[in-house]
Every structure is written in structure tokens, then in C-alpha cells.
């Protein structure tokens, strides 16, 4: 009897781990009508993610605006602050339940963008050339467009 209970417990534990692992990788997704993967979120979660994307875009705009300015030395502080505002600190407080709903490739792309924003801020402080900074931005924004090509958000009904 005791052996059977142990096997049942072990089986349930394994099933739980497999399901949790599958959800961690897949997230809460369905196939969209436009061939993109739909990430299913609550309306407030969707608004939070879209707001974060807008903040990332504003950070890119802040860096590009600084590069376009005449006074590069004065603009470096503005550029560094813009990039740093979208770094890993921005992603630190995301609700773990929300993160669980996101598919693994989406999480990887998003976190890599935040990490590279911090690296961009460091590069600005270290006086990388405008060309080097633009190359970094280009490497980041290609992931943004890839993500938008692959995913879309829908809300729970």
C-alpha cells in the first residue's frame, strides 16, 4: 500500500513538473488568424506589456534624438539616461504570473533588449562613436520587428 502511494505521489509530481515546464516554454498562447502566435493576457497585463514596449520605443527615440543633436557632449547624458531607463531595472518588477504567460522566446527577446539597453548606456558613457551606437540600436530593433512579426496580444474573455 505504501509503495503504491509513493508511486502515485511521484507520478503526480512528474506530471506537475512537466506541465509547469511546458507552460514556462509555451506560455498562454494560441495560433492567431494572421499566422502570428497570440499571447493571451488579461486586459491589465496586455496594457502593461504594451506600455513597456512604448517606453522602449521612447528610449530608442531619446538616443536617436541625442545622436542627431549638435552638442554631442551635452547630449550624451540625455542619451545615457534614455537608454538606462529601459534597462534591466525596467524589467525587474514584472509579476511572475505575467512572465509565466509569456512564451520562452518572447521572454528571451525582451530580456535581451533590456540587457542591451544597459550595455548601450554604458557604451554611451564610454564615448562610443555615433556609428557604433547606431549599430547597437540596429541590432536591437531587428529583434523588435521580429517579435512583432511573430507575436500579437489578445485578451482573455
Set out the residue ranges of the language-model regions.
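Helix-capping and short linker residues that terminate individual alpha-solenoid repeat units
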Residues: 87-88, 125, 144
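The canonical Cys-X-X-Cys-His
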Residues: 140-152
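Solvent-exposed, charged/polar functional surfaces in cytosolic regulatory/catalytic domains
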Residues: 62, 119, 143-146
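N-terminal export/targeting leaders of redox proteins
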Residues: 1-114, 155-157
Amino acid at each position: 500500500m505504501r509503495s503504491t502511494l509513493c508511486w502515485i505521489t511521484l507520478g503526480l509530481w512528474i506530471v506537475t513538473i512537466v506541465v509547469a515546464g511546458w507552460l514556462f516554454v509555451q506560455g498562454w498562447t494560441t495560433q492567431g488568424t494572421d499566422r502570428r502566435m497570440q499571447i493571451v493576457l488579461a486586459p491589465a497585463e496586455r496594457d502593461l506589456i504594451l506600455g513597456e514596449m512604448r517606453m522602449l520605443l521612447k528610449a530608442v527615440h531619446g538616443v536617436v534624438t541625442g545622436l542627431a543633436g549638435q552638442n554631442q557632449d551635452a547630449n550624451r547624458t540625455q542619451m545615457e539616461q534614455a537608454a538606462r531607463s529601459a534597462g534591466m531595472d525596467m524589467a525587474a518588477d514584472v509579476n511572475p504570473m505575467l512572465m509565466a504567460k509569456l512564451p520562452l522566446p518572447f521572454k528571451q527577446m525582451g530580456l535581451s533588449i533590456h540587457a542591451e539597453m544597459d550595455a548601450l548606456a554604458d557604451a554611451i558613457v564610454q564615448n562610443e562613436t555615433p556609428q557604433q551606437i547606431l549599430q547597437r540600436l540596429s541590432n536591437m530593433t531587428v529583434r523588435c520587428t521580429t517579435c512583432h512579426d511573430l507575436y500579437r496580444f489578445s485578451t482573455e474573455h
